Amino acid sequence: MDLVLEFCDSYFFDYVYATLLPASLSPKMGGTWQQAMIKEQMVNATRVFGRSLERPLEVYGYAPFMFEVSPHAFGSVLPRYSLLRQSLSLFLVTTVFGWLLYLIVASFSYVFVFDKSVFNHPRYLKNQMSMEIKQGLGAIPYMAVMTVPWFLLELHGYSHLYMGLELNVRGYVRLALEALFFILFTDFGIYLLHRWLHWPAVYKVLHKKHHKWLVCTPFASHAFHPIDGYLQSLPYHLFPMLFPLHKVSYLVLFTFVNVWTVMIHDGEYLSNDPVINGAACHTVHHLYFNYNYGQFTTLWDRLGGSYREPDHELFDSNLKKDKAVWEQQIKEVDEMIKNVEGPADDRVYER
């Protein structure tokens, strides 16, 4: 995350902090503030010195990495290495980029990929897409708050993220293996967490908000309880704390994860692949609840006995919107709702 933060600091935050909280305010802010800042500088300097004995400087905010430092970088009472500034900046970056990525990818999917016959499905909710967007946009800032501590750990050198790379076959193979391991590790972690979220007591408190959508639009991808979304993101943050991962790969994979999350909610069933947990598998999960908990592959569902092969009608452009097929889905869906949520269904359907 240091690459993103340095870019944002260089082109935006340095100027903003220097303008709103200039260094000239320091004498006016009292001894307590100055003592706190001096203490933080001493603690950070000690930490940097201690680590520099064993490995290169990894604590963000003391030395530039990619960009030239402008005068604004030293013009605020909150320098780049300030935990308060880093926390605020990371929250803003995570929230704004989260919103943009969600809206751009989901909108692209809606226009170019999404099968709009879903709107005619008997279990499509009244005003569903607007509710999905409202829920998604509302969840992202809360998720950002909970995610900031992980990014702070990365900024202060507590992860295994690295930047150098051998520009040869060995280096590229390493990147590929890291990405593959990332997918397998996070897929397993999400499988366990997702299955736990379906325990009745947990489901009703956290995960039910996401299962409000029985048939989905791309905007359902991030429409969940913020704690639910945060918990399912934990494997992505835990991985670089345990295993090496290139910093650029980290950013690419995080972007891919968000794109993939939209794709499995787009209702376009391109392939009935026995390995990939695509949109068809995830549609089965939303319709029938207790199957296909995985995010990327069917591996852990197969091993855990929770895999359900998508109905062949989903892959036929005519049959998947056939009224008889929908009626059969409704029977099983309604029975599953009673078993999982109880006899009262608080959803308001379009039809």
Curated annotation (Swiss-Prot):
InterPro entries the record matches: Fatty_acid_hydroxylase (IPR006694), Sterol_Desaturase_Related (IPR050307)
MF terms in GO: C-5 sterol desaturase activity; delta7-sterol 5(6)-desaturase activity; iron ion binding
EC identifiers of the protein: 1.14.19.20
Motif (Histidine box-1): 194-198
Residue ranges of the TM segments: 88-108, 136-156, 173-193, 237-257
Pathway: Steroid metabolism; ergosterol biosynthesis; ergosterol from zymosterol: step 3/5
Record motif Histidine box-2, residues: 207-211
Keywords: Endoplasmic reticulum, Iron, Lipid biosynthesis, Lipid metabolism, Membrane, Oxidoreductase, Steroid biosynthesis, Steroid metabolism, Sterol biosynthesis, Sterol metabolism, Transmembrane, Transmembrane helix
Record's catalysed reaction(s): a Delta(7)-sterol + 2 Fe(II)-[cytochrome b5] + O2 + 2 H(+) = a Delta(5),Delta(7)-sterol + 2 Fe(III)-[cytochrome b5] + 2 H2O
Record GO biological process: ergosterol biosynthetic process; sterol biosynthetic process
Role summary: May contribute to the regulation of ergosterol biosynthesis.
Protein name: Delta(7)-sterol 5(6)-desaturase
